[in-house]
Amino acid sequence: MIPQISQAPGVLQLVLNFLQVLEQQGFTGDTATSYADRLTMATDNSVYQLLPDAVIFPRSTADVALLARVAAEPRFKSLIFTPRGGGTGTNGQALNGGIIVDMSRYMNRIIEINPDEGWVRVEAGVIKDQLNQFLKPYGYFFAPELSTSNRATLGGMINTDASGQGSLVYGKTSDHVLGLRAVLMGGDILDTQAVPVALAETLGNTPSTVGRIYNTVYQRCKAQRDLIIDKFPKLNRFLTGYDLRHVFNDEMSEFDLTRILTGSEGTLAFITEARLDITRLPKVRRLVNVKYDSFDSALRNAPFMVEAKALSVETVDSKVLNLAREDIVWHSVSELITDVPDKEMLGLNIVEFAGDDAALIDQQVTTLCQRLDELMAASEAGVIGWQVCHDLEGVERIYAMRKKAVGLLGNAKGAAKPIPFAEDTCVPPEHLADYIVEFRALLDSHGLSYGMFGHVDAGVLHVRPALDMCDPQQEVLMKQISDDVVALTAKYGGLLWGEHGKGFRAEYSPAFFGETLYAELRKIKAVFDPDNRLNPGKICPPEGIDAPMMKVDAAKRGTWDRQIPIAVRSSWRGAMECNGNGLCFNFDVKSPMCPSMKVSNQRIHSPKGRATLVREWLRLLADRGVDPNQLEKALPEQGVSLRSLVARTRNNWHARKGEYDFSHEVKEAMSGCLACKACSTQCPIKIDVPEFRSRFLQLYHSRYLRPVRDHLVASVESYAPLMAQAPKTFNFFINQPWLKKLSEKHIGMVDLPLLSAPSLKQQMAGHRSANMTLEQLEALSAEQKAKMVLVVQDPFTSYYDAQVVADFIRLVEALGYQPVLLPFSPNGKAQHIKGFLTRFARTAQKTADFLNRVAQLGMPLVGVDPALVLCYRDEYKQTLGDKRGDFQVLLVHEWLPKALTSDARPDLGGEPWYLFGHCTEVTALPAATKQWADIFAHFGAKLENVSVGCCGMAGTYGHEVKNHANSLAIYALSWQQAMQRLPRNRCLVTGYSCRSQVKRIEGSGVRHPLQALLEIIG
């Protein structure tokens, strides 16, 4: 039995008082002080961890202004505040103690657009890709690019002055900010835009906080203008935080306070709104993927690409390429970046040409390719091959792979992981290759492995050395390397921070700004935030306050992680290896990961949030001398005893009375998970939440009783076959209002599915497929076996959607094969989901033994439901290891291509069919949609894939009362629009859960693709 974790870091009474006053005065947002909520805000995409006291989620600028006014009261003067966006920062920019002000949950509205003038006004929490999705119908996009664009907020981009691919042409975020609305400490509203210097002087003479800000920034930047121009490097990725250089335009005729706020990392004000310049979408885009024999060759050849008038040049090294090959993303780009025969591709330049003149762009591409051919013929520059990508879809797939590279590095094997701390250095592009030679020599001298990729056209290369942050010596080495890289960038006239902001690296600011300009930064900080209450420790302290700065060697996540025993860390690697890349925060509702995060917009209900909580839970267990691995081993031996039942009943009673246990907070986060397993493939680190969730639930319920519904769900494969003996009788009772009410109130289940009537057994009565024993099959000749197909049953289609199984048997027959319906053998998926892992292990072993015996017959085994079939490949392997055996159960679309003759039918024409894939299937088997389309094409029919996220049912998740509202809301995110837009009779759905959800919500059912094939065949 796990112990009660009764203590968690407390919250200061002053903080609680502040939050209470805030709510009393009309604050409309949310506040959070639970340990779980605070932990999810203690990390970002960096190596640092810093626990805040509370989190505030404002809904509007008015909420932020109220917050700032209340904070200005003398009794709350000691409280500090840090604005936070998407939490994707790589250097702890938004990590701090005190109170975190999260702009991402509610302040995500696009306020207005003026397409004629080319600008848009947004709130700070709008996500970059969300904005571009909105702008696309207008023919515009927001140009600054970054790899985390599907979860990074515009407020975060502005605060770090982010940039990425294409910056040589498009510049940084600050180049596209026309004006800002910000809230100052004290509650004053500051609106900024470029103004004539005369007006700036007038504003500076106003006797107000805003007036003092204008006056100070104007006077200090004007007085130091010559030094600023001399000191700031002449780089595309110019020095920001604070951007003294661009406050005035080159002619000194305009003054723009906006440029001080861009890159300020929340140290000056709360940025709540922005007016942004938007760019026309290019009509033509082409990519040339140039392959090299070494990474150095790719680097040294990059200037040649820029001279060819390319929009951008992105470079990827062999380490990143090889990690991409091992990821699901490679399936989407493998034909666009093929290997060169007899050559090893160790570097890649992704060269983009874009514009509105197709003839001009094609000529530029042709000229470049001709020159590349000449280099290859002469064996020069290390070029070994090239490919051109002409279509937009292919361009976007390649960039998706490149964007995922940053996360893929975290999936490197071993305890040492490539980490960010010197990953956005910038030097003049003409010096980049020589700089990288020295950088690599530095890392090689310490025996470190590393991955490299980046924007070579702008002189920025992302370098992530692999270090084990659980090793104190390697933590020291990180600081040593940082110091060396600072000196190296200075040697080449570059910057340590080319695009990701300073964060905990602010200690190096004096070295880059110089003593005089650093003093000016402090004066500017002082006029905005004289008491050092906004994200203190970042960029600089205000003049007059000698507060310490955050440092590179500050407390890191590894400080806490190393308190967990190595064996436990290794066993729970799914939770331990999450690096915070945040892909699970993807805003796109059509992306399968993560439905609970999408519907709640709460970080504790994301894979990252759940991994964070489990790590802390493991640490707290270790702190109490408890080894969860040993507890797991002991559980099967202990069995169920009266003593254990009494103890768990007592613990439940105390829990209902409000007794604190951190395990309850972890349980709450786990309960929101749909166990769809999208994270296990979509996450670059392959964080498998359902796997460690099941383990947690098993241990949690060693202390606390399970609800009745968990036992009912886990036992479905025991009672469903019995109920199917009399389906109409049981359906009669299931439909009774009193039973529905009883189920909802006392069991916590709603909309219970009806059994198939007639049952599968009744439908197959007398059919030869159901009358063959295993012994009869073993006695068949090889010739007879060649035409046999063994149908593996699952509990959901066989007992609740039997027509699908019956139709598959008919389809097999129509194709000239003899189907055999194998006896039902429990799969155990429901047991695994609910954390009955001891029972699941027994179920899995029994079924694996049966299927291994059947597999020896040499006949194909085929199952219908993706989630259940994939359980044989995933959960069985995790649980049984080598004892699983090597049986293979195919899905319908995997078997059909092998069964089809070479004679394809002519195109039938007519309306297409529309495929809705099960999210587990779509993410685990990315080729499935194309395979289904090819199968339909073989029969002369057209099948189009419908891009949707999760349907919201996920087995029994959608039937549980506590999940009902979220289940419907998840369906509404993407499925509902698609289902109502397309003809229902042409919509085909592979997953049983998904078909159930459609029928429940839309009132009419949909078919499995195999049923449409049966209709087509006639």
Predicted regions and their residues:
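N-terminal flexible segment immediately upstream of the FAD-binding catalytic core
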Residues: 1-72, 86-118, 147, 170, ...
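Ferredoxin-type iron-sulfur electron-transfer modules in oxidoreductases and energy-metabolism complexes
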Residues: 548-581, 585-723, 841-847, 885, ...
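A glycine-rich phosphate-binding loop feature that marks nucleotide/adenosyl-phosphate handling sites
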Residues: 88-90, 148-155, 240-247, 314-331, ...
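Terminal amphipathic helices with adjacent charged low-complexity linkers/tails
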Residues: 274, 308-415, 454, 599-600, ...
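N-terminal glycine-rich flavin-associated loop
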Residues: 46-77, 81, 99, 103-148, ...
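Iron-sulfur cluster-binding electron-transfer modules in prokaryotic oxidoreductases
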Residues: 529, 536, 690-1018
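Flexible inter-domain linker/hinge segments
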Residues: 2-4, 204-248, 254, 524, ...
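A gly/ser-rich beta-alpha-beta helix-loop segment of oxidoreductase catalytic cores
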Residues: 90-95, 135-179, 184, 229, ...
